[in-house]
Amino acid sequence: MISPVSSILASIWDNSKLLLDHTSVLSIALIGVACAISIRSILYVRLACANYSILLLTHAQRLRLAYSTPLRHVPGPWYAKFTALGLRANDVAGNRWYYVQGLHKKYGSIVRIAPEEVAISDPKVVSKVHALGTEFRKRQQPGTPFNIFSISDPKAHRTRQRFYAKAFSDETLKASTEPAVRQLIKTAVASIKRDAALRKDHTADVYKWCMLFGSDVAFQVIYGNSNTEGLMATQKTTDEVIMGAYLQRMNAWAQFCFPVFLLGRWLSPLSPTLHNIFRVEEKYGDFWQEGQRQREIAARTVFVQNTKYSKNDGVFSVSDEVKLSDVDIAHDITTFLGAGGEPVGASLVFLIWQVLRMPDLQRELEAEVAGLTEPITDATTAQLPILNGVIYETLRLYGGGVTQMPRYAPIATELGGYVIPPGTAVTTHTGALHRNPAAWDDPEK
């Protein structure tokens, strides 16, 4: 398994161009000045010249990217031609989506957000980038677990899809998870009522129980025993659900300014705040180890039912062409837990928040649901237009898991009237796409 620290360091290595982007001006210049001031031998002179040569080459490359590639025609803020610091600073602050969305509103559906990165929100362009058989590819980051989300080879990705196809089919999910999910709903509602009854102001932490519920739903799909071993049943906290977000924030700091990241880790024993930012992996070390254990167990459970297992090489086979190792399955399970639990919980929080803000809609929704008779199933709720409208609109505006989805152009490609050079990152974001006024009437409503 890949630890949080090794993943961060590998990501830093892969983003060395970005590190040069924000450290060359400061660190290289300071070293050069110090050497020039302290000229005691020819060695210092050569060292100063070498540093300034690196600085010169770095800026020459920056100018080339800014003015000598087809990306110079793509609209965007002036500084995006030279540096990705504006984007990385908003990554650190957790404002990337708002930042990019603001640029879309100002510059249009295709905008340059970094020297070698563009963001798009045009539906036709998005379809081209993510279409079946597209030439655009994911880029595997060093240190990133080789899982179904990060894999870049289309053939290998299809193998994984076929391996999990039956487990994620509607028929299998309804048969294996619907009764358990209904019980999870009862547990979450009862917990919210209990918390409200125990508090003097009769309030409850809806966010907490929605996040735990979402994680338990993902747990049920993967493990099949969430009502006895899930987060709600074992009285865990939301920290386990959002641990990945904290690790992403630490990684964002490492990519934004590596010297500051190292300084923060060095000073972290002096401040709990610094420790929570720069040494998150220590705070959640127990969770990480528990996750390792669970993934090892899970690699022998739900997804491997009705498969053939070879003890010699640790491979599960659906057929001669479709097979995965226990390590592959363990990596994928990590992804399924993160990509399933947090988005389900976050979307549910936004749904409740939106409905409570609109009393008329709340009354209509409650009246529609009150007309249902037991047993309430997925099939019966699918017939409720107001409920489904609320769900779809919540997912459109506030759907969980709305991180960017970068793809890389292998060859020069025309997108939306602009030529995208090979190697350029083309980033799509469901939040920006779903709020594009060219695609939706009054998208913010």
From Swiss-Prot:
Natural source organism: Cladonia uncialis
Function noted in UniProt: Methylphloroacetophenone oxidase; part of the gene cluster that mediates the biosynthesis of usnic acid, a dibenzofuran lichen product possessing a broad spectrum of biological activities. Two genes, mpas and mpao, comprise the usnic acid biosynthetic gene cluster with a single post-PKS enzyme, the methylphloracetophenone oxidase (mpao). The methylphloroacetophenone synthase (mpas) is a non-reducing polyketide synthase that produces methylphloracetophenone from acetate via a methylated tetraketide intermediate.
Disulfide topology: none
Topology with respect to the bilayer: Single-pass membrane protein
Pfam families recorded: p450 (PF00067)
PANTHER family named in the record: CYTOCHROME P450 (PTHR24305), CYTOCHROME P450 MONOOXYGENASE STCB-RELATED (PTHR24305:SF96)
Residues annotated as glycosylated: N51
Name assigned to this protein: Methylphloroacetophenone oxidase
Biotechnology: Lichens belonging to usnic acid-containing genera have been used as crude drugs throughout the world. Usnic acid is a potentially interesting candidate for such activities as anti-inflammatory, analgesic, healing, antioxidant, antimicrobial, antiprotozoal, antiviral, larvicidal and UV protection. However, it was shown to be toxic for the liver and to lead to contact allergy.
Matches recorded under InterPro entries: Cyt_P450, Cyt_P450_sf, Cytochrome_P450_monoxygenase
Cell location: Membrane
GO CC terms of this entry: membrane
Pathway stated in the Swiss-Prot or TrEMBL entry: Secondary metabolite biosynthesis
Regions that span the bilayer: 25-45
Family: Belongs to the cytochrome P450 family.
EC number assigned by the record: 1.-.-.-
Keyword annotations of the record: Glycoprotein, Membrane, Oxidoreductase, Transmembrane, Transmembrane helix
Keyword check for Transmembrane helix: yes
GO molecular function, one term: iron ion binding
